[in-house]
């Protein structure tokens, strides 16, 4: 009996230690939600509790949005007034309708709003991770901006800044100067199981590198990437090094007359273990860059 209780206790202990804490308070009134890929909710989220309302950054999938709202309600009962979409990709925006139904206004760059209206329907119809979008709807940004939009109540300040084209045409970031925090969307990921998506039709690789250089020059202590663990300026630099290395090797291969599949076999990105460890993702990225550069 004692042995059975010991084993049961050990199992519970191991299980609890293996569970990841999804929400962390990063500063007074600032909270981070870890996007759990194992539950098909892979996009990270940050929210800021202002004096009278909440601003959230990225909407996840509908089921992820529902959980995020539940977590926000554990921190405050103030209304969720704004949700910022860093870019149009489905894992960051398909939860928009859940937030709108809770009273929020969706915010993005003008380019992201335009991309969202013309792209993404196929992914919506297919669902994600075996889950259907039935019962939900696509919801587009109703508040857009050209270059910058600032929320400031004297306690918190969040600057929404257009950085695209880079990962997508309309990339935007959220910068919290007082807390020295940066929310990057997928301009930067950290430990994402599939590396990074470089296949977007409007991706601008050289501009993406310059954007990462610019962001790394800001006064930042904490980077909240689009996917994966919290990082620092070093995370931005690692992301840049991976993209630059892959881009250089593909360009060199094209100049040497090598085919796309030859480059998939030959290009070595193992020096970037956070990004280059997934062979399927790496192959997809190499093919995407090859096709774009050959246009």
Range-by-range predicted roles:
Residues 1-20:
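Bacterial Sec-dependent N-terminal signal peptides
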Residues 29, 48, 58, 72, ...:
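Divalent metal-coordination and catalytic microenvironments
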Residues 33-41, 116-125, 131-133, 192-204:
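Acidic/histidine-rich helix-loop elements
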Residues 217-219, 230-295:
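Accessory terminal helices/loops
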Residues 50-53, 63-107:
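Active-site metal-binding motif and surrounding structural segment of the metallo-beta-lactamase
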Residues 24-71, 174-184:
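Conserved beta-strand hairpin/beta-sheet module of binuclear metal-dependent hydrolase folds
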Residues 20, 24-25, 53-54, 61-63, 114-245, ...:
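Metallo-beta-lactamase
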């Amino acid at each position: 009996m004692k042995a059975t209780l010991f084993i049961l206790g050990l199992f519970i202990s191991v299980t609890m230690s293996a569970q990841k804490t999804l929400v962390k308070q990063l500063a007074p009134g600032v909270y981070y939600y870890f996007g759990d890929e194992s539950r098909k909710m892979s996009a990270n989220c940050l929210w800021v509790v202002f004096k009278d309302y909440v601003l959230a950054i990225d909407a996840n999938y509908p089921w992820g949005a529902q959980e995020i709202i539940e977590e926000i309600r554990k921190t405050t009962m103030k209304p969720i007034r704004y949700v910022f979409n860093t870019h149009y990709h489905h894992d960051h925006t398909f939860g928009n309708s859940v937030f709108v139904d809770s009273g929020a206004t969706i915010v993005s760059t003008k380019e992201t709003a335009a991309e969202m209206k013309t792209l993404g329907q196929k992914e919506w119809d297919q669902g994600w991770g075996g889950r259907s979008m039935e019962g939900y709807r696509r919801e587009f940004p109703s508040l857009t901006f050209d270059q910058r939009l600032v929320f400031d109540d004297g306690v918190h300040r969040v600057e929404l800044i257009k950085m695209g084209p880079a990962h997508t045409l309309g990339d935007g970031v959220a910068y919290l100067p007082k807390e020295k925090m940066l929310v990057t969307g997928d301009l930067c990921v950290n430990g994402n199981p599939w590396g990074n998506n470089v296949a977007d039709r409007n991706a601008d690789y050289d501009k993406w590198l310059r954007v990462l250089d610019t962001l790394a020059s800001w006064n930042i202590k904490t980077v909240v990437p689009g996917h994966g663990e919290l990082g620092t300026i070093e995370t931005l630099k690692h992301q840049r090094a991976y993209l630059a290395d892959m881009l250089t090797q593909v360009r060199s291969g094209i100049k040497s007359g090598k085919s796309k599949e030859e480059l998939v076999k030959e290009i070595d990105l193992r020096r970037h273990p956070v990004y280059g460890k997934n062979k399927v993702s790496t192959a997809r990225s190499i093919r995407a860059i090859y096709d774009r550069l050959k246009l």
